[in-house]
Regions:
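An N-terminal assembly and electron-transfer interface module characteristic of large anaerobic redox
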Residues: 1-284
C-alpha cells in the first residue's frame, strides 16, 4: 500500500508517475491516491480510505489512529529540527545519526499515542546527551523551496548532510507540521506583506515568509531548492532576490533535474560556505 498526497500543481501527478514506474518494475500493489479527491469533502477522503484499505473499518477507531499519526508527525518534525540545528557540532561523527536511527525504530514500533510520546521523550533525551561543541555564533542557513525537492534527501542529493558535514546550523520551516497541520496562508502572507499580496501557488508563500524570517533573525544565508520548471517557485525567485538585496543576505538557487550532478552541487555548496565563513570572519 502506497499513500500519495495531493497538490494543486505537478504534485498531484506524482502519484500517477510512481504508479507507472512501480508497475513497470513488476510490483503489484494498491495506491491510496488523495489527488483524486483534492478539494472534496472529508467524507470523500474517508470513502477512498475505506474502499482501498478496509471497507469494515470503524470511523471512530480510524479517527483515533489518525490523531495519533498527526502527533507522530509533529514529534518527527520537532526531532528533525533539533537534529538539523545541532548535528553539525557533534564531538564524535555519527553519534547523531546513530541516535536518530534508534529514534526512528522506536517510532516505527509505537502502537498508540502513549508510545509515540514515550519514544519522543527518549529520543530527545538521547539527542541532548550527545557530546557537542557548538560555537556561540555558528554559520546558520535556512532551507526553503518546493515541497518534495527541499525536504526529500534523494531529490536534493543530500543537501542537509552535505551542509551539516561543513559545520552549518540548519533550519527548515517547510515540514508537514507547518505546511499541513498548522498552515495558515493569510498569516504567512501578512508576515511578508511588504513583498507579497497574493498566494502564488503550493509553497510559495511559505518560501517567501521563511526567507524573510531567516533574514530578520540574522541568518547568514538561505538556500532555495526546486525541481526544474516548478512555476510557483520560479515566481518566488525575483521576490527572494529583493529580500536578499534589502536584508544583505545571500540566497543561492538550486534547480534539480535528471542532469544535476552531485559533484556540481558540492562545488556550489562549498563556494557558498566559504563565502559565508569569510563574511562572518570579516564581521568579527
Amino acid at each position: 500500500m502506497l499513500v500519495q498526497f495531493a497538490g494543486p500543481c505537478r504534485l498531484g501527478y506524482y502519484g500517477e508517475l510512481k504508479d507507472s514506474i512501480l508497475r513497470d518494475l513488476g510490483y503489484e500493489f494498491d495506491m491510496l491516491n488523495f489527488a483524486t479527491v483534492t478539494g472534496k469533502p472529508l467524507k470523500d477522503y474517508i470513502d477512498v480510505c475505506k474502499r482501498k484499505i478496509n471497507p469494515n473499518v470503524s470511523v471512530p477507531h480510524g479517527v483515533v489512529n489518525m490523531l495519533a499519526t498527526f502527533k507522530m508527525v509533529e514529534c518527527l518534525d520537532e526531532a528533525n529540527d533539533y537534529y538539523l540545528a545541532n548535528a553539525a557540532f557533534e564531538d564524535n561523527p555519527g553519534d547523531f545519526e546513530h541516535a536518530r536511527q534508534a529514534y526512528f525504530a522506536d517510532m516505527r514500533n509505537a502502537a498508540c499515542e502513549k508510545d509515540i510520546v514515550a519514544a519522543q521523550k527518549a529520543g530527545l533525551e538521547r539527542f541532548r546527551a550527545i557530546p557537542c561543541h557548538k560555537p556561540d555564533n555558528p554559520i546558520r542557513v535556512g532551507l526553503v523551496g518546493e515541497y518534495f525537492t527541499a525536504v526529500d534527501e534523494s531529490s536534493n542529493l543530500g543537501v542537509e548532510k552535505k551542509l551539516l558535514g561543513m559545520g552549518v546550523e540548519l533550519h527548515h520551516m517547510l515540514n508537514m507540521t507547518n505546511r499541513n497541520l498548522r498552515y495558515n496562508e493569510k498569516n504567512l502572507r501578512a508576515s511578508a506583506s511588504d513583498y507579497i499580496m497574493y498566494d502564488m501557488g503550493p509553497t510559495s508563500s511559505m518560501t517567501i515568509a521563511a526567507t524573510l524570517k531567516y533574514a530578520q533573525a540574522g541568518f547568514d544565508g538561505v538556500i532555495h531548492m526546486k525541481s526544474s520548471g516548478c512555476t510557483p517557485e520560479i515566481d518566488c525567485m525575483p521576490v527572494l532576490q529583493h529580500i536578499s538585496r534589502d536584508m544583505h543576505m545571500p540566497v543561492p538557487y538550486l534547480s534539480y533535474d535528471s542532469q544535476t550532478s552531485d559533484t556540481g552541487l558540492d562545488t556550489r555548496l562549498e563556494a557558498f560556505y566559504d563565502m559565508l565563513a569569510m563574511k562572518k570572519e570579516k564581521q568579527r
